[in-house]
């Protein structure tokens, strides 16, 4: 099995067991980035020297028993609107091309504490105002599955980096779909956490009452693990709360859960293959005990105008 067939948690387990080194995993990802970036262009900034130095330190701390988190030593990346001390944070804009923060965002501090190894900053729509990752000053990001297609946005670089297995997970931000939509375009898992569950301190804001930082990962278990690592009340963000940390059971059952199927989303123009895949997922939820319910949501026609008004207010 290739290193890149593993999920983040599977790699983390091998690192803890000494079967794979954090430095080995980091160097493998850096080599993959070098190979993939000419066509995918998921990154604005790659920090190979800092990443290897970080991996060496983390590996020593794992071997000494100091770092035991299941994601310790796992290579990852950060969307380029989250502050990283000493590493430029551009929002994919010419205006911030040379902006280097003097502090880490709270989420970066949390990942540092568990032993994450950051390889760089990922591309995005400029100032997160887009849904295709085509408006970046630093160039267009391509969908790794089909280079003629977009990866979605605005966290398209993070989604593409995970889909291309350049990293094992990445941070994105979501205001009106900027994690969830590129996750769907790139075939990875993305979560917009409940508002307030993850600190926004150090996130360059688009719409402060809507923004949330969240993960893009290979699967749901990775997403739960990364989300849990990010969560927690933060004195630097007055809107943050001590929300319950997600725990995935070994055997999922969804008895009693009602899942709405909005008919407005299944109208004319929807690709038949997309419809089939969505319903496959719905029927899998049904198999696990959920009840599928067709729902009418006429209010949906107001969602985009309302979003534009609120986001730009």
Language model regions located:
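Long amphipathic alpha-helix in the N-terminal Rossmann-like dinucleotide-binding domain
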Residues: 49-56, 115-116, 125
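Acyltransferase
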Residues: 19-27, 56, 248, 270-296
